[in-house]
């Protein structure tokens, strides 16, 4: 269509601009046509750009009107409670090393004498923790996580030795006698586990050691299986034509593919958790998947911001599922 318009305008340019110029007659109509041609050209560029989709996560968030979590520099977002905890534990956060920038910490209290939720793990735990922190009216919450770093009591494990900064902070938190609930979650599926360990047995041993220690604690422990991970960016699901926004109908993760991606991981969790019944296992699969597919959008709003991080809407759905397992939640 744009090509046809351009050909037609080219004829008009020849007929009413070039011929007018040669005849040295009025240039008013010629100027109008020139402006129209430039406008149409720019319009064509805009249409073509829309057909190519969205260019960034920021575009993705703005076009679909949802909040986008920012991980760029958590250090800039420390609140007064977090800073007070650092001072209390005599931890220096001001050196701003890369390790510390990747430490995701949030709190709505610095008083360890209060009844506490602790949420620990990697960036997945951090985003879930923000939702718990905002909604739990009974207990205060402290979120302590490190990007790409699972929770562990034992740094001698062969599985993912993690940053000393976050482990030092967590060891001090875990000494509090007023912990009432501990939530643990992290990125995990068959591919990521194998990529990190080269051997599933290493992860299985890590999980067994972790559950063994947690089963002896005097607070409730919730281990949350990771949400489905996508095989594509959700940004690719959006089609735009000027102001018309559509989600591709084929934009979902096939359930059988998801089950295949997590078969070994879930089998290990099931096997080990059977030995430690005190630990509550929460599988959020039913929240996002039916027997055919796992959804990525709900009423035109994305549940995922990228391949493995949920949007605030997605986290809210996950949190509502977790609440069902907590008897005393207010």
What are these regions (language model features)?
Residues 1-11, 15-330:
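Extracellular/periplasmic envelope-modification machinery, especially enzymes
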């Amino acid at each position: 269509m744009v090509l046809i318009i351009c050909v037609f305008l080219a004829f008009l340019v020849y007929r009413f601009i070039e011929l007018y110029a040669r005849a040295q007659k009025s240039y008013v109509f010629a100027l109008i046509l020139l402006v129209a041609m430039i406008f149409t050209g720019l319009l064509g560029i805009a249409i073509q750009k829309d057909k190519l989709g969205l260019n960034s996560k920021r575009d993705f968030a703005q076009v679909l009107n949802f909040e986008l979590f920012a991980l760029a520099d958590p250090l800039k977002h420390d609140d007064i409670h977090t800073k007070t905890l650092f001072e209390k534990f005599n931890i220096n956060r001001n050196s701003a090393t890369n390790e510390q920038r990747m430490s995701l910490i949030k709190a709505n209290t610095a008083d360890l004498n209060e009844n506490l939720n602790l949420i620990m793990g990697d960036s997945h735990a951090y985003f879930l923790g923000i939702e718990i922190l905002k909604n739990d009216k009974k207990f205060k919450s402290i979120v302590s996580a490190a990007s790409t770093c699972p929770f562990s009591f034992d740094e001698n494990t062969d599985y993912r030795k993690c940053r000393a900064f976050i482990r030092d902070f967590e060891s001090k938190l875990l000494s509090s006698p007023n912990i009432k609930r501990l939530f643990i979650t992290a990125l995990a599926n068959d591919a990521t586990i194998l990529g990190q360990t080269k051997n599933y047995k290493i992860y299985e041993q890590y999980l067994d050691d972790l559950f063994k220690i947690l089963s002896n604690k005097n607070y409730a422990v919730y281990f949350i299986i990771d949400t489905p991970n996508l095989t594509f960016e959700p940004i690719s699901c959006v089609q735009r034509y000027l102001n018309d926004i559509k989600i591709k109908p084929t934009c979902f993760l096939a359930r059988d593919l998801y089950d295949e991606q997590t078969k070994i991981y879930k089998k290990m969790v099931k096997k080990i958790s059977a030995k430690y019944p005190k630990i509550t296992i929460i599988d959020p699969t039913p929240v996002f998947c039916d027997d055919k597919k796992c959804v990525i959008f709900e009423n035109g709003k994305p549940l995922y911001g990228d391949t493995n991080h949920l949007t605030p809407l997605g986290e809210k759905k996950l949190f509502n599922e977790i609440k069902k397992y907590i008897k005393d939640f207010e």
